[in-house]
Amino acid sequence: MEAAVAAAAAAAGAVTTAVAPPPGAAVSNGVATAPPPFLMKTYEMVDDPATDAVVSWGPGNNSFVVWNTPEFARDLLPKYFKHSNFSSFVRQLNTYGFRKVDPDRWEFANEGFLRGQKHLLKTINRRKPTHGNNQVQQPQLPAAPVPACVEVGKFGMEEEIEMLKRDKNVLMQELVRLRQQQQTTDHQLQTLGKRLQGMEQRQQQMMSFLAKAMHSPGFLAQFVQQNENSRRRIVASNKKRRLPKQDGSLDSESASLDGQIVKYQPMINEAAKAMLRKILKLDSSHRFESMGNSDNFLLENYMPNGQGLDSSSSTRNSGVTLAEVPANSGLPYVATSSGLSAICSTSTPQIQCPVVLDNGIPKEVPNMSAVPSVPKAVAPGPTDINILEFPDLQDIVAEENVDIPGGGFEMPGPEGVFSLPEEGDDSVPIETDEILYNDDTQKLPAIIDSFWEQFLVASPLSVDNDEVDSGVLDQKETQQGNGWTKAENMANLTEQMGLLSSHHTG
């Protein structure tokens, strides 16, 4: 009986010895052990869907990727591994044979760490150095084909350091840019403050100036006067500039229209009265005695008012009336019915005055001494001969007086103008005949006219003058009806000169 109990105890001890695995062995006599706690915790952390934003399985489900390293070290490592050192976690992965798949991101892989195959974790062993017979060699399983991986170790740390350096450089550049922008903004603020201060100062100065000006009594009057002066200058600058007036000229001015001179002509009564007063003061006896000196002048006689300017006025010449005046009368102008006159006087008895016709060729007037003289009996009382000057009629030409040299003056044109030089004068003022007349305007009567008969007695000269005037009227009528040419004008002038000579000789 005792022998049987001893045998049973020996058998039980043998079984116990056979079941207990040796220390450090994963499998003993076909019985598997549990995987390491590090691998179990890592698998649970990666497989948890709540942590996919921080860490999750890779595209091939044979690796896991840490997407947010700072948050992984701050939140997950303390929860599962009781520390927050990401580098320590990477080193522990390296001891279990994990490798870094992608150098640009934190992706790790192991042939026994697969999604949905948690039982393969027991095949992952921790790498330790062998110590002789105490360790049992684990059976080697066939390795699954895994792409080339990079060992996590010193190389991974250096790469992380380089990445941190690049991030630091980027942050430093951004900091420098922000500092420059801050300096620029500060400078702009300072400039704006200075401008604002200057504006405030100017505003204060303006207010103080206005306050002083309002208290000043003469400020408003001076301001108004300056405005009036400015307005006057503007109005004066807008007015047309007037030509300077000649000495003794009339107040009315003439306007030049298309080369013509518009002249002011006084009424017949005023002009006649002025001339009559001058003539009555002359020494008639002394004046008619000097008629024998052959000092003659030419008077250009226009048509009467009834035969005013017409369409043929530009192609015909006016008639010529010859008369005698005193030698020393000194008349600057001799008024006729047309308002056009010229003077020709010399000291010699033979007077030859050049005549300028339309063709510009000067002609000579025959000897004017052949004109019969007036008897002395018809002369009024003696007075100074030089009194016969007409200051009231000298300024008929409002625009200007033309100074003609003593040698003669020629004016080409359809109307003939006589050049009548004098010995004692360097220049003779000539009036142009381009005058705008009105048919209603009364013209000054001619020398031989019925207007003067009521003041002067008849003389033998009136007969000759009447004949000459009748010839002139016939000449004008023929000229108006037939339109004389320039050659006919010259012929008619020569015929009149001959008629005067025949009367004198007869």
Curated annotation (Swiss-Prot):
Gene Ontology biological process terms from the UniProt entry: cellular response to heat; regulation of transcription by RNA polymerase II
Name of the protein described by the UniProt record: Heat stress transcription factor A-1
Entry comment, domain topic: The hydrophobic-rich region (HR-A/B) corresponds to the oligomerization domain. AHA motifs are transcriptional activator elements.
Coiled-coil segments on the chain, per record: 157-207
Position of sequence motif AHA: 449-456
Keyword annotations from UniProtKB, A to Z: Coiled coil, DNA-binding, Nucleus, Phosphoprotein, Stress response, Transcription, Transcription regulation
Keyword Magnesium: no
Annotated PROSITE patterns: HSF_DOMAIN
Domain of life: Eukaryota
Species, as recorded: Oryza sativa subsp. japonica
UniProt xrefs under SUPFAM superfamilies: Winged helix' DNA-binding domain
